[in-house]
Amino acid sequence: MPNPSSISAPYPLPEEIRNLLADVETFVADILRGENLSKKAKEKRDALVKKIKDVKSIYLQESQDKGDAEDGEEYDDPFAGPPDTISLASERYDKDDEAPSDGNQFPPIAAQDLPFVLKAGYLEKRRKDHSFLGFEWQKRWCALSKTVFYYYGSDKDKQQKGEFAIDGYNVRMNNTLRKDGKKDCCFEISAPDKRIYQFTAASPKDAEEWVQQLNFVLQDMGSDVIPEDDEERGELYDDVDHPLPSSSPTRSLPIDDEIYEELPEEEEDGALVKVEGQRKMSQDSVHHTTGDKSTNYANFYQGLWDCTGALSDELSFKRGDVIYILSKEYNRYGWWVGEMKGAIGLVPKAYVMEMYDI
C-alpha cells in the first residue's frame, strides 16, 4: 500500500466524503478519547487518528503552499465547503486565542478582578481550525466589563486569552453558524473591516440575553449621555469652595441634604420624611415631562439583574421588575430616578433596560 504522504491530491474530496471523514475524526479523536479503552483498542484508535491526519495533509498541503507563495493571502480550504460572507470574514480575522487581539490594547487582568461586569458566563467561541470541519468551537468564560468584551479559558484564569472593545460593532443572532441542535443558540459580533466574533450560548434564551445586553450597552454609548467637556469640568472644580445649588449634586451619589426637601412638622418619622421628600423632588423635577404614564412608553424600563439599594435613597428591585423612570437628572453619574410600586429612588442605569422598542 503506498504511503499516503507521497500521494498528491488530484482533485478535492466530494462533500459527502468530507462530511463522513469529519464525523469519523470527531468520533475517534474526541469522543473515544474520554472512553476507558483497552491497550489494543487505544493502539487502533491512535493508528486511525494518524491515518486521518495523513489524508488531511495530502489535501491541505498544496493549498497551504500556494498561500505561502502568494505572501500570506488566504488559501482555499478544500474541506471548508461553499464560501459565504460570514465564513470568509471569520477566516480573515479569527486568529488563535493566544494571539494578541486588536493590537493587545488592554493590559492583562484576572477574570475575578474585572470591574463593573454587566454580563458573564460560559460560551463556545468559534475559531479557525485546519480540520475537515474548517472550524472548531472552544469553551470560553466570557465577560462584558463596561464596554470591553473579555474571554478566558475559565473564570479562574489570571489573564484573558483575548479581548476587544465593542464600540463600533453590531450584534445579532445567527442560526447559520451551526447545523446541529445549537444552531438557535448562536450570535455574532461584527463590524466592517474588523474581526468577527462568533459564539454559541447554552440556550437560545441565554444567547438572546447576551445580544440584548450588548445592544443595550452599544445604544447607551450612542445615547444622550451628557459629555463632560472642559467647561463643565471647570465648573465642577471652580465651585469646590462654594456651596452648589441644591439641584446640582456634588458627588456621584447625592447626599441626603441635596436631594431631600425639608418638610416642616413631619420630623417624627425620619424615614417617612425622606421618602416623601424624595418623591416630591422627583415628581417636581419631571412633572412637566412625564405626562400620562399609560402612553409614555419610552420611560418604562425593566430590571436586568437583582439590585439591592445600599442606601435608603436607592431603589431595590429584581430582574424583570417594571420601573418607571421619572428623571435622568443624574445621568452623568450613572443614576436615574425611578418609581416602582409607589416607591421612588435612585436607579443605576446600567441595571435596567427599555421595555419597549420604540
From Swiss-Prot:
Give the Phosphoserine positions (modified residues). 5-6, 87, 90, 223, 282, 285
Q: Which InterPro entries match?
A: PH-like_dom_sf (IPR011993), PH_domain (IPR001849), SH3-like_dom_sf (IPR036028), SH3_domain (IPR001452), SKAP_fam (IPR037781)
Q: Which residues carry this modification: Phosphotyrosine?
A: 75, 151, 197, 260
Record GO biological process: B cell activation; negative regulation of cell population proliferation
Task: Write down the superkingdom of origin.
Answer: Eukaryota
The record's section on PANTHER family has: SRC KINASE-ASSOCIATED PHOSPHOPROTEIN 2, SRC-ASSOCIATED ADAPTOR PROTEIN
* Functional description taken from the UniProt entry: May be involved in B-cell and macrophage adhesion processes. In B-cells, may act by coupling the B-cell receptor (BCR) to integrin activation. May play a role in src signaling pathway.
According to the UniProt entry, the note on domains is: The SH3 domain interacts with FYB1 and PTK2B.
- The entry's protein name is Src kinase-associated phosphoprotein 2
* The encoding gene: SKAP2
